[in-house]
From Swiss-Prot:
Matches recorded under PANTHER family: PLACENTA-SPECIFIC PROTEIN 1
Main location per the UniProt record: secreted
Pfam families hit by this protein: ZP-N
Family label: Belongs to the PLAC1 family.
Protein name per its UniProtKB record: Placenta-specific protein 1
Source species of the chain: Rattus norvegicus (Rat)
Function of the molecule: May play a role in placental development.
Amino acid sequence: MKLIKFLGGVVFFTLMFSGYSEQNQVNVLCSTDWFMVTVHPFLLNNDVFVHFYEVHLGLGCPPNHIHPHFYQFNYRVTECGIRIKAVSPDVVIYSSEIHYASKGSSARYVIPVSCAAPRRSPWLTKPYSAKAPSSNMGATPKNDTSYHVFTLPEPSQQPNCSCPPYVFNQKSM
């Protein structure tokens, strides 16, 4: 019975990790500003090594980051003939192609690549009205050109927290 459980576990882990051993040949990421494609040198299959000078994105844009195990195309969405299509008020699809032309043979391939991105960047927030500073905020007097953003306590003052002594370079007593 233990042998059957052991063999079942081996088969389970083999199947689970075999999916992770395969590497994606093309990965695409995008935003409202950038289109990034990462290509593995064994793009076509495991027998043909694709050199960086044999591939380009869209209308002739070469890879701009070349590493031993991948080539990366990083371009603005307005470059390289990247096409933009709004599919909803909130989502845009960017698309292009990876073109492969072998220097050693007449082989040529075109691989379509696309990516969806939100129209609004999650990093940008809606504008809001600024409130007048409250009484506890530092304000600059009308005739003064500088102000203190914060002040550090004097060394003789004890910190107002329950921090361990080593945080403030104090020795335990």
